[in-house]
Amino acid sequence: VGVAVEDIGAAIALYEGNFEMALAHRETVESQGVEAVLLDVGEGHVELLRPLAPDTPVGKFVAKNGPGLHHVAYAVDDIDATLERIAAAGLTLIDREPRVGIRDSRVAFLHPRSTGGVLTEIVEPAGGH
């Protein structure tokens, strides 16, 4: 789950202090214009996203909607095959080609109009993650 935030320090404190999540990774993803944090929860993660500028996709989201749930992500073994299958099924891809995400993963987004109103991210984790 990706959560757009305005103050990443306060968000980390909220999740660590109240929901027993642990900071797993933090980096700036310049290509997406965000500071991203992964918090461990069970076998998955919550991803916190702070926009680096107001004209980035997450910055525009926060300006329009305020902080909150941004997207749901699903890990796959082969993002290229998954995107091909999804496109063939008629779903609308925001990204026809994967781009680099957190921890050098390969990511692509599907448009909410074809996924029940939910911005959906497909993630092929880099080796070892």
Predicted features and spans:
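Vicinal oxygen chelate
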Residues: 1-6, 37-40, 59-85, 108
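Core segments of cupin and vicinal oxygen chelate
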Residues: 3-45, 84, 88-91, 96, ...
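A short, acidic/glycine-rich surface segment
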Residues: 24, 55-60
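Structured loop/turn residues at beta-strand edges in well-structured enzyme cores
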Residues: 44, 67, 117
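Carbohydrate-associated surface elements
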Residues: 48
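Amphipathic N-proximal alpha-helical interface segments
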Residues: 51, 55, 122-125
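A general structural signal for stabilizing positions within well-ordered secondary structure
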Residues: 63, 113-114
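Hydrophobic, ordered structural segments
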Residues: 73-80, 88-94, 99-102, 114-127
